[in-house]
């Protein structure tokens, strides 16, 4: 039975051994929008009003999400009480839609233009939406699996190249990997129609990218079944692991930075500047440490669950094709 403390310890150890490559991989994931996209938000959140006196009025533009831009273009107001279905969808489908279309957010900006008119703009916007979905399904999903392969390999050997994250593309397994991730996404979208099912299945299907990373030739349905099998009895414990990592490395740093930024800003008379610096500091912490550390910790969790399946000679454990991924990680830093 795995313990949270040991999982975190292994994650830190793995990060310290390959920190440069891990930072590079996580940065690529954030830059493309495959994962950790929120970690780079601070780049565009530095307040330009920070260079002005705090008592000067500055009019700032309110940024809308891709989902909100789409509803605005369709003239749908989910808050007016006449569209309860759209209001409910915004809570579940909205964030998923924003994630899938993140790489092509620029096209959604067309929807916000005051002079938006003409079929050309409409076609461009539709092409942007279709392109964003295509890019997310067929490219970003493979990058996500490739990143899992990188972290699995970096767990058992040093000096791993970031080229490992591109293995789904150049080893002839791209089609099967993307099919598996697409099937997982379809299941998740269907489960959003339920209240309790979605968070449960979110954890049940969590190991699918790792399974496909280890065995890119695994059948999508078998990868999903094996993930459910691995997470059986571990969903709550995994949720607690997520919660502790969030509290320790997201909530508390943000809260502390906010308090320090506001306090120092009040003392110096530059509240906006200090708060902006605090936001950048938290963002850099995520990019330079937290993302890599958490990814390494989740890789250690997969290795522990994988070993438990092998020890029990569980069904579908034959899908684990790389024995080294089940070995104990090196202890040296």
Question: What spans do the regions from the language model cover?
Answer:
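Hydrophobic alpha-helical membrane segments
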Residues: 1-333
